[in-house]
């Protein structure tokens, strides 16, 4: 079958699945997208903030430049970041290349585009149960609970079914050598949303703020709606409150106090009603995924979180997935007889580098070790300051989100960081452990007593 006209099955209708479906439909291919949910309820209120950097923007532009116009109407340009530790401003990062929005909004504008595309069919209520690699069949569970099987032998299958990908799980044991690493985040993120036009002394809506002590993050959307994201780390004393689902007076008061202590600059943004609404919102978790390869011959390929789940502090979740969609489409349209293998060979060095970066950040985010968390703050400050400290390899954030950010391959950006991290971070961690150990000894030492005169 001609690879340029071969039908395509896409699993998953998130931003990555719809992105690749729309790109492939441009060439007249018949594309069918299978989605587990009966209906996609896409609202900012039950989503989370993301920044769309030049990687994600380029994919949206290639699909339709009007999508970028929608993004700019709804979002806010991020002029930069401010990083706080212990209530003190410790680092600044300039940007001007990233647009602030929510994952739900990006998904929404892509879905609206997909629903109007005559070459694209969206099939809802089909949750992938398993993949039969030998028979080239896909087995779905319908909303009714019944199973149905789709013969996909004559199609190319693109699995964009997310971090908990049923496709990826199915390949284990069926595909020799396929043994992905799955590292659960160990945290859940949940978001407070302000009323439109909210303001607070010391906060600039063109800036995003990171409060390192408790892993809090604030960002703005259109109409100066502020998002204040909190991090519930498994096993910590804050976790029950941050995951509570009842807006009791006690919970609301405790959450208000938590925000005042952890991110005091954001407290004036939020009303009591904003705190009440928080307890009715979803929380989000995930995992860092590292696969040894992402294709099964020329029949199936994994992209997005199914292939390389990251963690929000990377800023690359949706962006890297949208870039997958664009690069995979270029290989499929190249005329090569082996586009999936070509994509795998070209993309894996970048995914390996991104995976190592994400794994490191995951271990820091979920750590309850104060020494590691202190070392991480120091390492992150060094990464932002970079040049003045002679740590050019630490400037990952600047190259991903700074004023000159572009689509430089991840391997080129992250290789120097990986080399330096392997040398420097263990030293920082050891020094922090020693410092905390000394502090504990001093606290235990009995006070000196004086002999009576």
PLM regions and their residue ranges:
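Conserved FAD-binding catalytic core of PHBH/FMO-like flavoproteins
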Residues: 112, 117, 126-130, 135-283, ...
């Amino acid at each position: 079958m001609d690879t340029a006209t071969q039908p395509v099955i896409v699993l998953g209708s998130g931003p990555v699945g719809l992105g690749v479906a729309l790109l492939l439909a441009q060439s007249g291919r018949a594309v069918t997208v299978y989605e587990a949910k009966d209906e996609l309820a896409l609202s900012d209120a039950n989503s989370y903030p993301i920044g769309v950097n030049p990687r994600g923007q380029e994919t949206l532009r290639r699909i339709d430049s009007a999508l970028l116009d929608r993004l700019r109407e709804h979002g806010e340009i991020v002029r930069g970041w401010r990083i706080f530790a212990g209530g003190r401003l410790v680092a600044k990062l300039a940007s001007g290349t990233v647009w602030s929005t929510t994952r739900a909004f990006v998904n929404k504008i892509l879905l609206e585009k997909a629903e109007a595309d005559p070459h694209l069919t969206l099939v809802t209520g089909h949750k992938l149960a398993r993949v039969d690699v030998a028979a080239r069949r896909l087995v779905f569970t319908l909303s009714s609970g019944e199973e149905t099987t789709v013969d996909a032998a004559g199609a190319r299958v693109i699995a964009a079914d997310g971090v908990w990908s049923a496709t990826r799980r199915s390949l284990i044991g069926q595909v020799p050598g396929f043994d992905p690493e799955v590292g659960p985040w160990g945290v859940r993120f949940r978001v407070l949303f302000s009323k439109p036009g909210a303001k607070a002394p010391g906060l600039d809506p063109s800036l995003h703020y990171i409060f390192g002590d408790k892993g809090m993050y604030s960002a703005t959307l259109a109409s100066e709606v502020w998002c204040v994201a909190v991090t519930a780390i498994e096993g910590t004393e804050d976790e029950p409150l941050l995951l509570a689902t009842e807006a009791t007076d006690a919970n609301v008061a405790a959450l208000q106090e938590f925000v005042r202590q952890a991110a005091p600059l954001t407290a004036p943004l939020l009303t009591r009603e904003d705190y009440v609404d928080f307890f009715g919102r979803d929380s989000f978790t995930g995992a860092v995924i590292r696969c040894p390869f992402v294709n099964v011959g020329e029949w199936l390929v994994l992209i997005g979180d199914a292939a390389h789940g990251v963690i929000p502090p990377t800023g690359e979740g949706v962006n890297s997935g949208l870039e997958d969609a664009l690069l995979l489409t270029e290989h499929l349209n190249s005329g090569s007889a082996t586009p999936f293998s070509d994509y795998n060979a070209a993309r894996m060095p970048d995914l390996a580098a991104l995976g190592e970066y994400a794994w490191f950040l995951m271990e820091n985010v979920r750590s309850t070790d104060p020494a590691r968390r202190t070392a991480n703050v120091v390492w992150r400050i060094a990464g932002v300051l970079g040049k003045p400290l002679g740590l050019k390899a630490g400037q990952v954030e600047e190259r991903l989100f700074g004023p000159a950010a572009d689509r430089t391959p991840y391997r080129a950006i992250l290789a120097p960081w990986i080399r330096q991290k392997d040398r420097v971070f263990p030293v920082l961690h050891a020094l922090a452990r020693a410092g905390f150990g000394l502090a504990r000894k001093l606290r235990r030492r009995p006070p000196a007593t004086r002999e009576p005169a």
